[in-house]
Amino acid sequence: MSMFNKVVKEFQWGQHKVRMETGEIARQAGGAVLVDVEDTVVLATVVAAKSPKPGQDFFPLTVDYIEKTYAAGKIPGGFFKREGRPSENETLTSRLIDRPLRPLFPEGFYNDVQVVVHVVSLNPEVPADIPALIGASAALAVSGIPFNGPVGAARVGYKDGQYLLNPTRSQIATSDLDLVVAGTERAVLMVESEANQLSEDVMLGAVVYGHEQMQTAINAIHELVREGGKPEWDWAPAAKNEPLIAKVTEVALPLLQEAYQLRQKSARSQKLKEVSANVAAALAEAGVEADKVEVGNIMFDLEAKIVRGQILNGEPRIDGRDTRTVRPIEIRSSVLPRAHGSALFTRGETQALVVATLGTKSDEQIIDALAGEYRDRFMLHYNMPPFATGETGRVGSPKRREIGHGRLAKRALIPVLPKEDEFAYTIRLVSEITESNGSSSMASVCGGCLALMDAGVPVKAHVAGVAMGLILEGNKFAVLTDILGDEDHLGDMDFKVAGTDNGITALQMDIKVQGITKEIMQVALAQAKEGRLHILSNMQEAMGHARTELSAHAPRMITMKIHPDKIREVIGKGGSTIQALTKETGTTIDIQEDGTITIASTSTEGMAEAKRRIEGITAEAEVGKIYAGTVLKLLDFGAIVNILPGKDGLLHISEIVNERVKDIKDWLKEGQQVRVKLIQADEKGRLRLSLKAALAEEGGSISPINAGESAAPAAPAGGSEQQ
């Protein structure tokens, strides 16, 4: 009899066979599920503390998605040969798992919960993020931890008018859509997507299709729980302190209502601090002992009630706008004189300074992904220092939020970038958030597009982004355009839509409550389009098209092609030739395996010289052609003459003139410029030259050295050639 109480569930899910099992591996974890999708295998585990930490006022959920290199049959690089800090993909996938799980933990549950997902086997054609999300949901479901799941997830592609369920990597590469949707049986909770300018209807259809298809996985998790689940925790939220709620409400409600009539964020924030101080003083005067965390939660509920009530009753929003109005926009381009491209995009109290830098092929980011190494020619980095919100804080390496916001903005811009054969530059965008009051990632999209255009990148269209919110109470709802930070915090849905005049390029949706219908999402997407088109009109007015000239400080670039067999000649022994070329011409030279050479420099003269010299190095000597050569060395029986870079031939003593030559030094000297004809090239590459044949063909003459300078015309420097 086995020591394991193993439960296995298998099901067909689109083109993939899925296997979920629990009860064998990681039995001391609160919950552990192994998910196998066509040889992509993840181990998802969850552990929760039995009680919250004293004074805990938030839900401490941690999600760690970890890719093990052995999953792809690799040994890690570096000195220590161990997996190091999380890659960008690991960070983004951790966020992808976190976002749909977090809203499903019950209110008031403040115990530490840690979800850890290990990728232990990888089929390069099957991405691990969907199995990881399904596994994390299943591990929570079997653990008995308070959780209103399970959650299902699906990836949706779109090609030739058809939706694709969980497409392979090869299919994603040719798809017009890469969308991940997660949710419960009843509702969608999270959407993350990149699209090739698709309509709102197609995007909404993909969300609905993904939600329908994920039910297969949700049903399988239910079956797994029935057979292998642990008992549910005996947990209930702490009883509400009604007397405290009444006292805080009595003191705070009128003051909070006053605070939310202040339209400026700084004034409102100051007023809210005063309200908190007044409440604390009133409680102390009344002799009420209250936990600071508990009072803070009551205050938050009151703020939410005020803001949400005002909006649903048709009153102005926090800053005085109606539900559809976008904040005032100001745009300035070419902000930084030495940058290749820059733009300052300001929308209300949110501001992004976005800077574009152009580089060469050698500047591409080399990403050693689990599925295989690849190069990325477009980078977008998002930074939000603490001063952007008027606070102090840590400045340093990017946090998960910054990495996630940067990736969203990048997704929005990728569909409008020119192809590499149209614009060979490596592009880096950096978005510096200098002010923030909501929607900074969408400001990065707008500013990023303008910075690209300012740098002379021929983007296909303007791209704008807008952050939307939603307030839902029973059958009443209101969709908010261009939300503030407080509206994001107090609302039920945060979704960001970016795109062009022609369609959506990126969509990110996070829903905090269940009950948002297809019809509500339809209204929200239509209102988002209205806001996006308004922002696009402002951007088009500020900058109608990309600059036709690159910045004077940006590198110029030319591309040429040589035969792959000639690459080693250009590189030279130990890289000597190419190193000399780059140093002497002041250029950067990149050589691809197919023989494509990219020469970049801020000097057009340097590029032209480098190209000319490479053409000389790779040129083939042709029999019958006359070359301008240089005498390198004199021999008793002739001379060695260089006719092309790296191409030397023998000028035999009998091929100098038609008469008998007793001493070659009477006719030639080292360093002398002569015109010679290539008369023979054997299979070993040895060249035979003739001076007298060239003289006869061109009608020239040569005299002995002691009779004066050679009559042969001097060849131009660099070895030009003539038929």
UniProtKB/Swiss-Prot annotation:
Its EC number is 2.7.7.8. GO terms for cellular component: cytosol. One of its GO terms (biological process) is RNA processing. InterPro entries: ExoRNase_PH_dom1, ExoRNase_PH_dom2, ExoRNase_PH_dom2_sf, KH_dom, KH_dom_type_1, KH_dom_type_1_sf, NA-bd_OB-fold, PNPase. Belongs to the polyribonucleotide nucleotidyltransferase family. Residues 624-692 form the S1 motif domain. It is an enzyme of class 2 (transferase). It catalyses: RNA(n+1) + phosphate = RNA(n) + a ribonucleoside 5'-diphosphate. Its cofactor is Mg(2+). This is Polyribonucleotide nucleotidyltransferase. Residues 555-614 form the KH domain. It is found in: Cytoplasm. One of its GO terms (molecular function) is 3'-5'-RNA exonuclease activity. Involved in mRNA degradation. Catalyzes the phosphorolysis of single-stranded polyribonucleotides processively in the 3'- to 5'-direction. PANTHER family: POLYRIBONUCLEOTIDE NUCLEOTIDYLTRANSFERASE, POLYRIBONUCLEOTIDE NUCLEOTIDYLTRANSFERASE 1, MITOCHONDRIAL. Residues 707-723 have a biased composition (Low complexity). The keyword DNA-binding does not apply. HAMAP family: PNPase. Mg(2+) binds at residues 488, 494. NCBIfam families: polynuc_phos (TIGR03591), PRK11824.1 (NF008805). It comes from Cupriavidus taiwanensis (strain DSM 17343 / BCRC 17206 / CCUG 44338 / CIP 107171 / LMG 19424 / R1). It comes from the Bacteria. Keywords: Cytoplasm, Magnesium, Metal-binding, Nucleotidyltransferase, RNA-binding, Transferase. Residues 701-723 are annotated as: Disordered.
